[in-house]
């Protein structure tokens, strides 16, 4: 009957309105309680989350010194759903924690803020540093998802001995998500860190993710082959879906010597 159809429409309208109210309420709470500035992660907090035992004997070429590296950061991100969202400034200091797992593998956790953490486990084999596992943890008002996915087959991140002009392309699965990534070494350069000149190669990385969380990721990495760390890292990331994330940030290494855990 007509009143049943009308009642069904009312129910659908009420459910949709309730969903909008929940999203708006969450964004409003975040604005009132946390403002528009993300929180910086301290060295101590980053050290607490360094995976592995710290120092390992005879690390392979391509394995960086373990510890916490501090980076000056300038950036922002937007978190939201559809037209509703909040832009928040990222803190002026980011931390990257490196933990040695074995002589040929290590984990890197990039603390862009307390609310945005990126992690990768790397393995070194066949002249390449490869990504084996990736983590993305983004929260809003303490609510979010710590997404961890195995990468199969492990894509190539950077050659152990990179050369200008090298290019490579990989297709892999991040869990159930298909990913295509292409990289090239654009040029050699030199950056100064703490008064010391550091030779680097500039790597351009472009990736596209499909599936339930589609998005794009564009990176420019000023990579130190000798130290196996980024001296400068520029990230542009866009993730779509029910929840959306846009990140624009640049990190500059403050000190070549990491803060290490006590042995």
Where are these regions (language model features)?
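Intrinsic structural disorder
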Residues: 1-2, 128-129, 195
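N-terminal functional modules and adjacent low-complexity/disordered segments of proteins
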Residues: 18, 22, 26-27, 42-45, ...
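Acidic, serine/threonine-rich low-complexity disordered tracts
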Residues: 26-123, 170-263
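An acidic-aromatic
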Residues: 105-159
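N-terminal Sec-pathway targeting helices
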Residues: 2-23, 28-29
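Secreted/surface-exposed cysteine- and glycine-rich disulfide frameworks
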Residues: 141-193
């Amino acid at each position: 009957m007509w009143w049943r159809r009308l009642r069904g429409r009312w129910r659908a309208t009420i459910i949709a309105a309730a969903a909008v109210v929940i999203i708006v309420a969450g964004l409003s709470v975040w604005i009132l309680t946390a403002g528009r500035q993300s929180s910086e992660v301290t060295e101590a907090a980053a050290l607490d989350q360094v995976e592995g035992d710290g120092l390992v004997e005879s690390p392979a070429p391509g394995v960086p010194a373990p510890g916490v590296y501090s980076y000056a950061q300038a950036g922002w991100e937007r978190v939201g759903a559809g037209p509703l969202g909040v832009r928040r400034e990222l803190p002026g200091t980011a931390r990257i924690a490196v933990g040695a797992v074995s002589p040929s593998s290590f984990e890197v956790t990039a603390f862009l803020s307390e609310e945005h953490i990126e992690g990768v486990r790397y393995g070194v084999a066949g002249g390449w540093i490869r990504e084996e596992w990736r983590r993305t943890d983004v929260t809003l008002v303490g609510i979010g998802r710590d997404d961890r996915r195995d990468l199969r087959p492990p894509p190539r991140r950077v050659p152990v001995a990179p050369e200008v002009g090298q290019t490579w392309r990989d297709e892999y699965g991040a869990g159930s998500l298909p990913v295509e990534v292409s990289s090239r070494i654009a040029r050699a350069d030199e950056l100064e860190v703490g008064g010391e000149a550091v030779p680097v190669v500039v790597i351009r990385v472009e990736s596209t993710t499909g599936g339930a969380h589609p998005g794009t990721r564009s990176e420019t990495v000023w990579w130190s082959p000798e130290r196996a760390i980024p001296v400068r890292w520029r990230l542009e990331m866009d993730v779509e879906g029910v929840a959306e994330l846009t990140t624009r940030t640049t990190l500059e290494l403050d000190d070549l010597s990491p803060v290490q855990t006590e042995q």
